[in-house]
Every structure is written in C-alpha cells, then in structure tokens.
C-alpha cells in the first residue's frame, strides 16, 4: 500500500498569529502499525493559549501512539479504533489540566485525526475541523461538525446555507481540553485505491463551498492542490488560519 501525503498551514489575511497545528506521518514513520497518521487541530483561547492547546494535543497524542505501537499490532478494527479514541481522551485530560493555570484558562482545540491501517481508514474527531473522503469523483464529509449551527441544521432550524453565514457559526459545542472528559466521534471507513483524503480546519470550509473544494481536490499534485485550497480561502477573505492535509492512496 502506498500513501502520499502533504500538509501545510497559513495564517490567513486577518489574524496575526496561527493557532492551528498539524502532523503528517506516513509509512516508515507512522506509529501503531499504520500506513499513515494525519491530524489537524485548531486551537482556541486567550493570548497564545490556542496555539499551546493545538500543539500540545497533537504532540501528546503522537507520543501516546508511539508508546502503544506494540499493543496495537494484533488488534482487530474495533479494538484498534477504541484504542485511538481512548488515547485522545487521555490527551484531553492533559490539555484540560494545562488549561487550569493563569493565561491558559479555557483553552482548547479541535482535533480531527485519520489513521490508515490495512486498507482501512480510522477516524477520530472532536470539534469543527473536518475530514473528507474524495472517492469516485465525489467529495464526502466523513466527520460531523460539533457546532451550534450544525445542531440547528440537524433540528431543521437552519439550512446548510444559512448555517455558513450565521453569526453563531463559530460557536463549537465540543473541544479537546475544555472539560475534564470529552466524547470522541469515531468511525471506520472503507477506502480504495485512487481515493484522496482531505483534513482541514474551518478556515477553509467556512469560506469555500464543498462544491468548489471538490473541484480543486479532484486532480493535481498534492502540494499544488493544497496551496490552491489555501489561496482560494484567502481570496474569499482569509479571516482565519487555514490548515490543509491531503493524502492519496494506491493499493
């Protein structure tokens, strides 16, 4: 199995610092017997606390995965996914504890992670960053936004189009580190050769429609495509940090 991946981040046109973090580890460097580990995180909090939260969550999760590699080798899909979720819950506690000191109170971060293992995609997710699967020429969101407007969409109060421009569109309902415990969305997704994966923070999808993202992701080299996504977000206003990870799969 061959996995190629590329990640990049951009501060945007409005913010003066970047609170996003990401990690890309592929075959030979990926932990837990995986072909790839891909994570984006979008921090929040006063001063530099958001940057601390996103970086801390990713670094501690990767360290935990490295330590769990020997335990993960023989696990079936369900147990493997549960292990990933449990590791993120432990990281949540660490970020929450770090957020109890002055200057970092209330800090937290989104966390969207994908692990490719044995031709299966494992997804763990908290917050409103997103994971997409591009397969058969169609871009499909495989995470659910933990946001106030998404809850209203599910209740039929707002349409998707109304949610994108609603004043409360940035209010999230779940994040790593905001509380001592967190609920983690988790899923195993079928993948096939030729598929592409996209992970992004909301600096992209809050400004760029999924239909346009689909058009950009459909072809081109990963690095050029990632830069095109960031350029498009900045052209649409660039009012937030934008982080992109793209991966292509070949079996």
Mark where each language-model region is:
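PP2C/PPM-type serine/threonine phosphatase catalytic domain
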Residues: 1-251
């Amino acid at each position: 199995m061959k996995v190629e991946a590329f990640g990049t981040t951009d501060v945007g046109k409005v913010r003066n610092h970047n609170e996003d973090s990401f990690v890309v580890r592929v075959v030979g460097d990926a932990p837990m017997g995986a072909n790839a580990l891909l994570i984006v995180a979008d921090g929040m909090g006063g001063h530099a606390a958001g940057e601390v939260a996103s970086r801390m969550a990713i670094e501690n999760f990767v360290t935990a995965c490295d330590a769990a590699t020997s335990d993960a080798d023989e696990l079936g899909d369900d147990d493997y996914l549960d292990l990933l979720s449990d590791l993120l819950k432990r990281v949540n506690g660490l970020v929450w504890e770090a957020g109890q000191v002055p200057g970092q109170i209330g800090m937290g971060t989104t966390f969207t992670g994908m692990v490719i293992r044995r031709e299966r995609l494992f997804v763990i997710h908290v917050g409103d960053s997103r994971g997409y699967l591009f397969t058969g020429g169609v871009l499909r969101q495989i995470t659910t936004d933990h946001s106030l407007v998404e809850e209203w969409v599910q209740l039929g109060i707002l349409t998707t189009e109304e949610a994108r421009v609603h004043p409360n569109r940035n209010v999230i309902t779940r994040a790593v580190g905001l509380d001592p415990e967190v609920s983690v969305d988790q899923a195993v997704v079928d993948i096939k050769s030729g598929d592409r994966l996209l992970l992004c923070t909301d600096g992209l999808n809050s400004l760029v429609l999924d239909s346009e993202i689909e058009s950009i992701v459909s072809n081109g080299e990963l690095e050029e495509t990632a830069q095109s996504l960031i350029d498009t977000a900045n052209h649409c206003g660039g009012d937030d940090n934008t982080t992109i990870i793209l991966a292509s799969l070949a079996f």
